[in-house]
Amino acid sequence: MADSTLRGYLKSYVISQQGIDNALLHADQTWQSESSLRLMWQGGSTSTSSINYAWELHYQVNPIFSNQLVEAVNFQSTPPANYRLTDIDPLLIDEARRPVLQNLDRLNIQLQFDQGDLTIGRQAITFGSARIINPTDVFLPYNVTALNTEYRIGVDAIRYQKPLGQLGELDMGFIFGKDGHPDSSAAFIHGKANLAGTDLEFAAMRYANQTLLGAGMQSALGSLGFWLETAVVNGDRRYWRTSTGIDYAFTESMFGMVEYHYNGAGAADSRHYLSTAQTSAYQVGGVFLLGQHYLIPSLSFQATPLTTLGLQAIVNLKDKSSFWSISATHNVLDDLYLGLGYYHFIGKPPVANQTTPFEPGYLAAEYGTSPDAVYAQLSYYF
């Protein structure tokens, strides 16, 4: 016997972004509205046989309106072409200031055996022990400025997950790139276990002629939560990425965390940020931070049973630039939420090329070229 459900959400954002005028970019003040309608149809068998199945289909459409062609900060979560065998045209309506984007984000079937689950099709795949930046998570992670990150971007894969005891799992699969070409595809094996109350993870991946080996752990240090995640990548170049941090519940309504992230793929000098962003680590390896050393504090506060406040900063410790985000969310009705937010960027502005004025300059700081922005959000779930 089969059963299915249809649910979804409608989210609308209104964003105001400051004007900007520096050596690399000029844009007037930008007003933008973006809506996101996501339909989620899923179901499966309800029999007691040794083989059951489940399936899901998610389709999302995003109408956007902007008064400017230039967007200095990327608020969208549109998936790139990486790790999809083929795809529908992401542009449903191609108009410069009024595009309509679409995304077939899930289309898979899962065969559920006594020994484990086999999932075939477009699905979400994510790894990692860290809370904010995951070194072992290379398959389409969100940029930190994206607003709608509720559902992870789907990739085309064949994946097998086998439970190991009560808390362990062996997870392996193949992810298809464009046209199934080996150079754009990936393979992975990932394991989880629990040893004396400590959650352990390991990962091995091969993607775009790069090899990743990683491990992670989560545990408790008294009243603190602790995590450590690290990965080394060998390919075009060799680099390490590591995240470690702690979290703490100050009260029943206030929760804080801080994470340090080392990004060996990043540039040691801000002059090389733009060229570094063109390397394979950024194009196919899930890296988006341009520098090397970061401190990321975060604080959330339950002001009332229906209102949550949040504060987070990403601080580049080398060039002293930072990205701050402040948010407030209020549960208006059972399925209706109102949100407000503010993005604030601190950093030295980019520097013009004094020797050859026809060539672009360079970034003096990672967040020095980004204008501040405010947004309002209304979300309805059905």
Predicted regions and their residues:
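Detector for outer-membrane/organellar transmembrane beta-barrel domains
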Residues: Q218-I314
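Transmembrane beta-barrel strands of outer-membrane/channel proteins
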Residues: G8-S16, Y53-Y59, I120-R122, M172-F176, ...
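Residues that define the transmembrane beta-barrel architecture of outer-membrane proteins
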Residues: A27-L37, V100-D105, Q112, R152-D156, ...
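Repeated loop/turn-to-beta-strand initiation elements of outer-membrane beta-barrel proteins
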Residues: S4-L6, S47-I51, Q115-L118, L167-L170, ...
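Residue-level signature of outer-membrane beta-barrel architecture
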Residues: S4, W41-S45, L111-F113, K162-L164, ...
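Outer membrane beta-barrel
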Residues: S49-E169, G347
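Transmembrane beta-strand segments of Gram-negative outer membrane beta-barrel proteins
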Residues: A2-D21, L25, I51-Y53, G168
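Outer-membrane beta-barrel "beta-signal"
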Residues: L295, F301, H330, L336-Y337, ...
